[in-house]
Each structure stands twice: as C-alpha cells, then as structure tokens.
C-alpha cells in the first residue's frame, strides 16, 4: 500500500511547484485615496479611482485581482471588485451615512490577486493604502433659536449699540449649512435693527411716556437660505431714567403667627445704574416700640409669667398700686400700658421714699437681707433730656441697709447712655465700687426691662433678657459716705453729709422733706414700672431671659452662604440689623435672607414699621450715587384664636339633705375643658366630584394653660346666712392659685394647666344651711387664658333643691299626697323665681294612673270653680245696690253661699314661676268672661308633657 501512495503524492506536488513559479508578483495600488460620499447616500467617489495592478498579467489567476479588504474598527464601508482583469474596484457605504454623526472616516485598503488557480492558492496581497472619506452635508436641518422668548430692558432717551443678542443654531454638519448667515425682524414698523450676528439695537430714542413694552418677531436663515422653522419673540421694556434704588421689594409684608422665620426682601436687588461701588452698608430697622413694652412678649400677666418661667417667689414690689397699705406712690403720675400694667411717670422733680417694715415688705430682716445677694428688676423708658447736660446724673434707686456689721449702701443711676451701679459693702471700713455699662437702650426713649444681679463682687446687668458685663469698674474711694440710717428712695437720692451745702444750689436738687434734714438730688426723669427687689437667691439667666426677652425681631441665619467680605451685625434687642459688603450681587443675596421672626404662638397682631437705610462708597466720589430710603411694614395677622370649651351636666337636682351636708354638692362633677384652634384648610379636590370645591376649617386640640376661672350667680347674689360656695383652699395654695370668694362670684386666678383647673373646679361645691327654703339656683362658669385675652364659653348649670312636704288631710278627700302642697300651706316667697330640675322628678311625680286621675279631677274642680265664680259674680251684680260688693242678700241661701272649704288648691313645686303666672292669667280671664273659658283651659294647662297640675291664684286662710 505504501509504494502506491508515494507516487500519487509526488504527482500532486509537481503542478503546485509550477504554479508558484507563475504568481511571482503581488498586486499594486495607490498609497492614499481621497473619497467623498454624499449624506444619505452610499457611493464613494475616490480620487484617484480605485484600480489594482499586477505584473503577472495577463496570466490567468496570477494576473487577476480577486478583491479588496478594508481594515479598521467599525468601518461603515465595503470594497467590491468591478473587473478582475483591470483591477477596477469600488468603495461604497454599507448603509447611508450621516454627516451629523461623523463627518470624516479613515481606514486602510488592501488588494489581493486570485492566486495560482481557481482555488485561490498562493494568493498575494498588495500593500495597505490609506483611504480618507469625507461625508458631504445636505441642508436637511432648519435653524433653531436657543430661546423662544427674549427679554430686555432699556432706559429711555438712550441709543444702544446692542440691547440684546438673539441666537439660532443649525443642526447640519457643514459650515455652509450649519452657519446662520443672517437674521431678520418680521414685525414691521419697529424702531429696532438686527445684524447678521443677531444683535438688536434701537434706531431711535425710546420714551417711557410712549410705548413701555415693544414686542416683535425675528427669524434666522442659514447659509443654504433655509429659514428657521419656529420664529423667536422679543420683548423690550422701556424704563424711565435710571435712578439708583432698591428694586423688587414689597411695602406690605404679611406674617402669619406660627410661620417661623419669614424673609422680608426675598426678591430685592440694588440698582446702581452701572456706577461701580466698593462699599455698601445697609441698616434694617424694625420698630416695635408701640407693641406693649417695646416688643412682643408673652401675653401672660407678670405673676403668671414668673410661675411659667420657674422664677423663685419672694420678690417685693417697691412701686405698687396706690392704696391704704401703699400710700408712698400716691403722689406719682400713674399710666397704664397696653397690657394693663401700671406705669409711673417721674418728671425730674419728684421721688418716693419707700417705708421700711411691713408696709413694703422690707425692713432690717436678716443680716444679709439686702447686703450682697439680691436682684433688682424693673422696666424703664428713658431718654436724654434736652435741657439737661449729658453728665447730669439721675438716680433710679438709692438704698442704705443696716446689717450686723454696720451699714451698706447701693445706688443705681443713669447719665446719658450710661447706667452705673454704686455699691458700698460697708460704710465704716470698705471702699465703694462703681460698675459702669454703656448701652443704647438706656437713652433710646423706648421700653426695656433691666435686671441687676448682685453677688458681690460679681455684678451682672440684664437688658431685655440679655446679659451685659460691666464695661468699666471704678474704685471710688474718695466718695463721702452717705448717712448711716436705713432708707430706700426711688427716683432720687439724698446728699451725703459733707456735700450738703454744695448740693443745695444744684439744678437737680431740692430741700429735704419734713423729717429729713438732708437735701434730695439727682432726680430721675422717665418712666418706671414693675420695680421689685428680691434678696437671697438670685434669678438665673434662663429665668430672666424667659421672663423679659423679646419674642419678635430681625433674624439672619444664612451664614453658610454668606459671601466673602460680608459682615452682619444684629443689636441685642434684634430690632436693628446691619449688613456691610463690597460686591453688589453678594450684598443682594445677603439682604434677601434677612427675616422677621416671632416665636409666640399667639403673637400680638398689628403693624411693625420697617425701614431700610443704605450708604454706599464709590470709586469716583464726584459721581457717587445716593440710595433712597426704603420704608415698609410687617403686618402680623390675627392669630387663630384658641377655643376654650366648657362642657358637662347643665341641669341636675338633689335632695335638700345633700346640699345641707358639711361638704355640700359638687357643681361641676363631670366638667370637661378642651382647648382647640380652628384653622383654614383647603379641601382636596376629588376628580369624581362635579360640584364646587371650597375651603373648610379644621380644629386641632392643643395643650394650653388657663390663667383664671370665675363662678358667678345668674340672678340674685348668694345669701351668706343661708348658702355658700366651697372650694379646697389647701389645694389652691399648693398650686399657687389665688381665690376670691364673694356673694356675687368666686374667682380662681393663676396660670395652670387645663387638667389642674378641671380637677379644682370639679371640687367646687354648693352648700345650704339646714332649713333654708331655696329651690333652685343657676351658676355661670367661664375661664380665660393669656391675661384674659381669650375667654371660654359661658357654661350655665341649673341646680334644683328637692324638698319633702308632710301629708296634709284634705277636706274633700279628692287628693292627698306628700308630693303636693295644700293651699293652706302656701310656699314661702323665696320659692318665687326658682324652678326644680326635671332630670330627677321621679321622686316627686306620682304614677301614671295617679297623674291621669289628678288631671281629670282637677279639670272637674276647675269647672265647678268657674261655675261658682260665675254665679257669685251675677249675684254681686244683682245685690250691688243693697249691700257691699261680694255680700249675699240672704246668707242662708245655699245657692248663693260661697264655700271656700270645698275648694282645694294644688301647687306644683316643679313648675317655674313663669308658668304659674300664665296659669293665673288664664284663670283670671275665665272669671271675667265665660266665653273665654276655652282660652282659660289652655292657659291653665302647663306645657310640661310629664304632668299637668291645675293651679289657682293663692289665697290666705
């Protein structure tokens, strides 16, 4: 088998060897080709044309070109052979090309021959040539404007080279079709021109008095003269001559209580009229002096607020209401603030000397009573008096205290905008120390609260709840000591012994009053209120801040985004905020974040005037602009008033023995007090609902405090000898509440939670003295909060007293029951005007059968009585001439004899006095006219649907 295979293999190799010798050369092509293909087409035009040459031609296979190969990643083209003999080829795109996707393509091409036979054996390849194909653009896209609407503003009377520029773009890839060659204004008769770059200018000076807003349409064309598919609108606003000022602010700013922080100028910007500035300073001033005492504070009374803030008790009021026990303030001029607090006016020529001892609650007391640990607290409104020198000292308080070691002395004075505290620990040995503060609050003629804590040698002054350390401390060792006698004076001070003669001639001094040999000087000129002192434990900073800090003011919190070079300063009372910077845009951003804030849930409604003052510095002082002042106001809206609802049992009756017990009967055993706020809520729109969607109100229950409740009488006052209102005094004192109990009302005063007031009012009891003939009482309960600013509904409770009546034998035997009164037992006059409760009538109402019998018998008796009355009246008319009215001519005549013993009068104590009046009127009408008997019957029938008892006017027997 092997000898046969070898010749066959040799025979197959011999022809191959001869063919390799025939295909001696590889194909040849150009080194580089440049091609062009039209967009959206696939035929590439090459320069030079694609031809491949082979030196083996004209041999078959070896001299023929079988094809071309393209090399490159993602080449969207292919090469095809058109003529193998000539080597002509063609490059075409696999699919239409997009110029916008790719403008040029680069790849390599290589030709290969057909080898040495039909099977392509021993194929040779040419070198690789570079092909550059450029995609020619077609103007398929129209210009498109970047904006559909262009806006600009111009100042009147000026010609602008360029007001604004409109811009259009073209999506084509070639410069010829992608470039915008020119723009055109389509709206005729407009005083504007547009150039080929889209710049718009005015052809004449525009006037603000003429047309204030110009609107026109522009279009664009590319270099292929294709017009924009959508035109653009242009609006040019004509403004008056530029005046440097603040723009984009609102004069009226509404603030809803509970809204937190509200930006005052969210859209404000400074118009400088292109004047370069290098420094801007703005001051925002919020005026709150007209709101209570200088600003919005908690609306509770001073006493209630001290309890809420956790202040320690024990303060002594040095300027109380003038009265028998506080006559030292009688000579001062008295005013009242908006919150009804007492204000005293010191005119610079008067002062008060507070008596020591029980009257003022002061006195010698323990050794350290007012020596080196105490707190002075007061409200002051003080300004610089024009006719007095700036160095004129005015004394607020002057006090000398006696203790175990001797005498100590202190005084608090103001001079100008400075406030000074002089403290002399021991007149005999120690040296005086003077603490000075310079505060703008002292002389701004506005209300401020001051609290001075002395814990010697530390002295801290609080103004509106903000603490201030002394700016300067003097050791005034050369001051002559005052007299060694305990004394306390407000509004002035007494002169020391050594300076007595010197001070007599001063402008701010007078002779001493009777009993005081020393002159008084350094009178105070201003307002004082709430002047108190407390010794021992000092008020903490938190308590003072809670009591007297302002709850409204200017606020700035955006410090994180505060630009470089910006400065922000807020005064302690938050009524003045200052901004300073050098960049206009940064300054605008900072001013837009200045806010108003009021932390009170029930803020005081009203207007807070607002003022913005600006000072600028320019690079050119000659042409520096001036920014006018901005004035506006913040309107604090009326807060949603809390609705205090009192509810419970409004009518009940109890036996008299319950009222006569030692504890009486609770008036409000199941009292419920709720506090809620109703606010406007926008109703959600239901798509299936075809009607009108309106706003509604939603009520949210809140946790709140009450500061007073009153139980008053509806009708006559209480008779102390027969009735009284009772309340547990120990429970009230434990909670710090005050009780006022009179014959007309009972009041509970003091701030406490609703739960506590519910508990206390449920303990309110009504008590009667044993045997008191009272049948009904009405009580009115009402509560209030926030110093009486909000009041509850009037909850009226009607109380009925059920009395037991002994059985009385009736001569007619028609009715005998302990529930009914015989006419011989006329109820006392006290019963008039009172009604018994219907909710507990079962104990006095007979059964249904008895009730029917009573009604029927009563009706029969009424008919008999009416008949007798009719006969009696006729008899009186007949015999009127012969005898006195009402006398019978024949007393023995049984038909004309008036038998009172046969008539039974039944009185229903369950009916009101008014119902009985109606019955009496009806009965009287029946006696006058027989034809009105039907009306009498209706009038004699009470409206009560439980029982009907016939009544006649009472008679004495």
UniProtKB/Swiss-Prot annotation:
- Membrane topology recorded in Swiss-Prot or TrEMBL: Single-pass type I membrane protein
User: Transmembrane residues, as ranges?
Assistant: 849-869
Extracellular compartment ranges equal: 20-848
Keyword set, alphabetical order: Calcium, Cell adhesion, Cell membrane, Cell projection, Endoplasmic reticulum, Glycoprotein, Golgi apparatus, Membrane, Postsynaptic cell membrane, Repeat, Signal, Synapse, Transmembrane, Transmembrane helix
| Primary location class | membrane
Q: Where in the cell is it found?
A: Postsynaptic cell membrane; Endoplasmic reticulum membrane; Golgi apparatus membrane; Cell projection, Dendrite
A Gene Ontology biological process term: regulation of excitatory synapse assembly
Residue stretches making up the Cadherin domain: 29-145, 146-246
User: What post-translational modification information does the record give?
Assistant: Proteolytically processed under normal cellular conditions. A primary zeta-cleavage generates a large extracellular (soluble) N-terminal domain (sAlc) and a short C-terminal transmembrane fragment (CTF1). A secondary cleavage catalyzed by gamma-secretase within the transmembrane domain releases the beta-Alc-beta chain in the extracellular milieu and produces an intracellular fragment (AlcICD). This processing is strongly suppressed in the tripartite complex formed with APBA2 and APP, which seems to prevent the association with gamma-secretase.
- The signal peptide annotation in the UniProt record is 1-19
* Entries under Pfam families matching the protein: CLSTN_C
Describe the subunit structure.
Interacts (via cadherin domains) with both alpha and beta isoforms of neurexins (NRXN1, NRXN2 and NRXN3). Directly interacts with APBA2. Forms a tripartite complex with APBA2 and APP. Interacts with low affinity with KLC1. Interacts with SLC23A2/SVCT2.
| Protein name (database record) | Calsyntenin-3
**Organism field:** Bos taurus
């Amino acid at each position: 088998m092997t000898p046969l295979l070898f010749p066959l293999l040799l025979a197959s190799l011999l022809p191959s060897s001869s063919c390799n010798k025939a295909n001696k050369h590889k194909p040849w092509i150009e080194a580089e080709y440049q091609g062009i293909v039209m967009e959206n087409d696939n035929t590439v035009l090459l320069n030079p044309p694609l031809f491949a040459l082979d030196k083996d031609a004209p041999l078959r296979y070896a001299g023929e070109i079988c094809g071309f190969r393209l090399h490159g990643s993602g080449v969207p083209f292919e090469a095809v052979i058109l003529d193998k003999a000539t080597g002509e080829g063609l490059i075409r795109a696999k699919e239409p090309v997009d110029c916008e996707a790719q403008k040029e393509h680069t790849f390599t091409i290589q030709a290969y021959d057909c080898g040495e036979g039909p099977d392509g054996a021993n194929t040779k390849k040419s070198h690789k040539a570079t092909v550059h194909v450029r995609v020619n653009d077609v103007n398929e896209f129209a210009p498109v404007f970047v904006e559909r609407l262009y806006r600009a503003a111009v100042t009147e009377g000026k010609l602008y080279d360029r007001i604004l520029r409109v811009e259009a773009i073209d999506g084509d890839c070639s410069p010829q079709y992608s470039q915008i060659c020119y723009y055109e204004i389509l709206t005729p008769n407009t005083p504007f021109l547009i150039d080929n770059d889209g710049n718009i200018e005015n052809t004449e000076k525009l006037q603000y008095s003429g047309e204030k807003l110009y609107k026109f349409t522009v279009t664009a064309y590319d270099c292929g003269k294709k017009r924009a598919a959508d035109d653009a609108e242009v609006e040019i606003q004509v403004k008056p001559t530029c005046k440097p000022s603040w723009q984009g602010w609102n004069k009226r700013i509404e603030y809803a209580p509970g809204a937190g922080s509200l930006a005052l100028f969210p859209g404000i910007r400074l118009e400088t009229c292109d004047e370069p500035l290098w420094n801007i300073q703005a001051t925002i001033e919020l005026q709150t002096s007209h709101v209570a005492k200088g600003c919005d504070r908690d609306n509770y009374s001073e006493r209630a607020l001290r309890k809420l803030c956790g202040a320690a008790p024990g303060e002594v009021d040095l300027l109380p209401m003038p009265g028998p026990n506080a006559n030292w303030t009688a000579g001062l001029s008295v005013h009242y603030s908006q919150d009804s607090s007492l204000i005293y006016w010191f005119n610079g020529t008067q002062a008060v000397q507070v008596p020591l001892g029980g009257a003022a609650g002061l006195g010698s007391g323990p050794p350290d009573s007012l020596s080196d640990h105490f707190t002075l607290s007061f409200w002051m409104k003080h300004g610089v008096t024009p006719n007095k020198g700036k160095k004129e000292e005015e004394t607020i308080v002057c006090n000398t205290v006696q203790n175990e070691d001797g005498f100590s002395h202190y005084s608090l004075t103001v001079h100008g905008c400075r406030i000074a505290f002089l403290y002399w620990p021991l007149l005999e040995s120690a040296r005086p120390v003077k603490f000075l503060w310079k505060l703008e609050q002292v002389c701004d003629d506005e209300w401020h609260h001051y609290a001075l804590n002395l814990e010697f040698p530390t002295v801290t002054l609080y103004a509106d709840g903000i603490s201030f350390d002394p700016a300067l401390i003097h050791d005034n060792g050369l001051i002559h000591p005052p007299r060694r006698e305990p004394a306390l004076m407000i509004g002035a001070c007494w002169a020391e012994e050594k300076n007595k003669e010197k001070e007599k001639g001063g402008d701010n001094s007078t002779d001493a009053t009777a009993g005081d040999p020393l002159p008084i000087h350094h009178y105070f000129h201003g307002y004082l209120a709430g002047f108190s002192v407390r010794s021992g434990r000092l008020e903490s900073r938190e308590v003072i801040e809670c009591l007297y800090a302002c709850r409204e003011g200017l606020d700035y919190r955006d410090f994180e985004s505060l630009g470089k070079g910006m400065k922000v300063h807020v005064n302690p009372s938050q009524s003045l905020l200052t901004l300073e910077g050098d960049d206009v845009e940064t300054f605008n951003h900072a001013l837009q974040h200045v806010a108003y804030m009021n932390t009170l849930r029930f803020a005081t409604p009203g207007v807070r005037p607002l003022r913005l003052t600006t000072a600028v510095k320019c690079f050119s002082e000659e042409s520096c602009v001036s920014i006018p002042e901005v004035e506006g106001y913040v309107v604090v809206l009326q807060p949603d008033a809390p609705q205090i609802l009192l509810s419970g049992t409004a009518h009940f009756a109890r036996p008299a023995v319950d009222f006569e017990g030692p504890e009486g009967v609770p008036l409000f055993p199941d009292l419920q007090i709720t506090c809620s706020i109703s606010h406007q809520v926008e109703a959600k729109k239901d798509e299936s609902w075809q009607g009108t969607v309106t706003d509604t109100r939603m009520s949210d229950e809140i946790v709140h405090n009450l500061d007073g409740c009153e139980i008053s009488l509806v009708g006559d006052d209480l008779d102390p000898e027969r009735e009284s209102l009772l309340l547990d005094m120990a429970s009230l004192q434990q909670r710090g509440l005050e009780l006022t109990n009179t014959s007309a009302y009972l009041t509970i005063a003091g701030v406490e939670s609703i739960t506590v007031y519910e508990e206390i009012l449920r303990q309110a009891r009504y008590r009667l003295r044993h045997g008191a003939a009272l049948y009904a009482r009405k009580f009115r309960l009402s509560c209030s909060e926030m110093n009486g600013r909000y009041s509850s509904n009037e909850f009226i409770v009607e109380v009925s007293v059920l009395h037991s009546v002994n059985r009385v034998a009736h001569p007619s035997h028609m009715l005998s029951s302990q529930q009914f009164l015989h006419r011989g037992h006329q109820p006392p006059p006290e019963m008039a005007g009172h009604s018994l409760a219907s909710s507990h009538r079962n104990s006095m109402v007979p059964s249904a059968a008895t009730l029917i019998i009573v009604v029927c018998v009563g009706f029969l008796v009424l008919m008999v009585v009416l008949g007798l009355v009719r006969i009696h009246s006729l008899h009186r008319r007949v015999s009127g001439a012969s005898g006195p009215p009402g006398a019978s001519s024949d007393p023995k005549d049984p038909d004309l004899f008036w038998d009172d013993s046969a008539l039974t009068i039944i009185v229903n104590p369950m009916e009101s006095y008014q119902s009985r009046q109606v019955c009496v009127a009806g009965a009287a009408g029946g006696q006058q006219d027989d034809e009105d008997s039907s009306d009498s019957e209706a009038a004699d029938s009470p409206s009560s649907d439980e029982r009907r008892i016939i009544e006649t006017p009472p008679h004495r027997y």
